[in-house]
Amino acid sequence: VPAKPRRKSPALWPRILLLAVLTVAAWLSWVVIIPVDLPQSPYKLTIGPNRTLGQVARSLADEGIIRNRNIMMLLGRAQGMDRKIKAGLYQFNGSVSMWNILQRLADGHPDEASLTVIEGWNFRQLRQAIDRNPDIVHEARDWSDAQLLQQLGLNDIRPEGLFFPSTYLFTPGSSDLELYRRAYATMQQKLEAAWAARKPDLPYHTPYELLIMASLVEKETSLDADRPLVAAVFVNRLNKGMRLQTDPSVIYGMGTAYQGNISKADLRRDTPYNTYTRNGLTPTPISLPGQAALEAAANPANSSALYFVAKGDGSSYFSETLEQHNQAVRKYILKKGSND
């Protein structure tokens, strides 16, 4: 009698199913929970405006930060992140899992970014700094200065000096226009305060003229203690009808022709900004003045000085007479030149 075929035990199928489930679970755990070492720390994930979850997942997968972009998209959509993902800069350190990334994006709190605007910069340098900042959305990069000012509601005015130098914190993904607006509004507030607190009988007719003076002071010295004295020299010269004769104004008027050195011919070459050939203040500011320069222009030192010369250590020597000034020039400039 032939033997009957043996039946497979019914208990084998649950085991196979359990093994399959455990295998999938282990794979999902590896994909979702097990961290990946980052290529650099901190790793910066920048998400621009209107970027989709799929685009973010693809970018992360291409860089090897996540192991499976489709799983990230499924999990993200299950949390509704395809509708509420927030633009910005997200920083991660050491190692990170897909789950860590999803939770950060779901929280929607990107790290802050910063833009530092230096005292004494000109408007061209400000634009370059904003254009180079990778955390800013660049709407105005290809606009002319006039187009940019028009978007800010400013017409028939030069941009120089209108933006306050400071460090601005912002949410990554912010528009460059927002940064320009903040810097302009801050300068207006600072200028109004300086104008309201100014000494009486200064030779400024408008806050804008005070701003021009502050920009000249800013370019002449970076030493806080000297700024009120420099402002006093300029105010005294204006009151006496003397020309300001400040080299930074000549350099500004030279534009791109300035290559690091200024000659006697440059001092004689007339431009609207040459305070050796023109009376009074320059037609516009020549830099972005900071708080100390604004305060110095509004409250110059009580001094009769009409001249100053750089001493070579960052400070200046101030003189009331031309004879004293010439002696200081011989001491600090000519003597130094002969020793070099």
Task: Give the ranges of each region predicted by the language model.
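Signal peptide-directed extracytoplasmic domains
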Residues: 27, 31-194
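Bacterial extracytoplasmic/cell-wall-associated proteins, especially those involved in peptidoglycan
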Residues: 128, 132-139, 149-340
